[in-house]
Amino acid sequence: MLIGEYKHVVDNKGRVTLPSKFREELGEKFILTKGLDNCLFGYSLKEWAVLEEKLKKLPLTSKDARAFLRFFFAGACECEVDKQGRILIPQNLREYANLQKEVFIIGVMTRIEIWSEENWQREMADESLSVEKIAQKMEELGI
C-alpha cells in the first residue's frame, strides 16, 4: 500500500528522487500520467493493467469517455527508476502539473501523486476538505 507524504526537489534535468517505500511498491518501471486536480498519477505496471481493464469498459459512444481516455492515456509514459532512485519526469508532464523546484509525492493506496508545492498547499487549504466535512463523508460511506 502506498501511503505518506514526502517533499522532494526536481533537479534541473527534470529528475526527482522517489521515496524508497514507493520504489519498492511501484517497481523499477511504472506508469506516470496526468492526474486530476493538476497533479500526476503514478501506477505500478500491475495496477495500471487493472485500471486499463476497467477503462476498456467505458462506452466509446460517450464523448466524455473518449475525452477522458485521450487525456489519461496520451499523457502517460513508462518511467524507469535509475540507480540513484530517481525518475525523469517528461517536460509535458512537468508543465501540466506546474512542477518547478519543490514537489510533494504522496501515497494514495494504489497510486502515487506528484504535486507542485503551490498546488499541494492550495489543495490542503481547500475549505471543502475540512475535518468535519471529511468525517461526514466517511459516515455517509459507512467508514
Swiss-Prot record:
- What InterPro entries does the record tag this protein with? MraZ, MraZ_C, MraZ_dom, MraZ_N, MraZ_sf, SpoVT-AbrB_dom, SpoVT-AbrB_sf
Which UniProt keywords are given for this protein, alphabetically ordered? Cytoplasm, DNA-binding, Repeat, Transcription, Transcription regulation
**In the UniProt record, does the keyword Cytoplasm occur?**
yes
Q: Which GO terms describe its biological process?
A: negative regulation of DNA-templated transcription initiation
Q: Which GO terms describe its molecular function?
A: DNA-binding transcription factor activity; transcription cis-regulatory region binding
Compartments it resides in: Cytoplasm, Nucleoid
Highest rank taxon of the organism = Bacteria
**Ranges where the SpoVT-AbrB domain occurs:** 5-47, 76-119
Q: Which GO terms describe its cellular component?
A: cytoplasm; nucleoid
Short name of any one Pfam family annotated for the protein? MraZ
UniProt record similarity statement: Belongs to the MraZ family.
Q: Quaternary structure per UniProt?
A: Forms oligomers.
Q: What is this protein called?
A: Transcriptional regulator MraZ
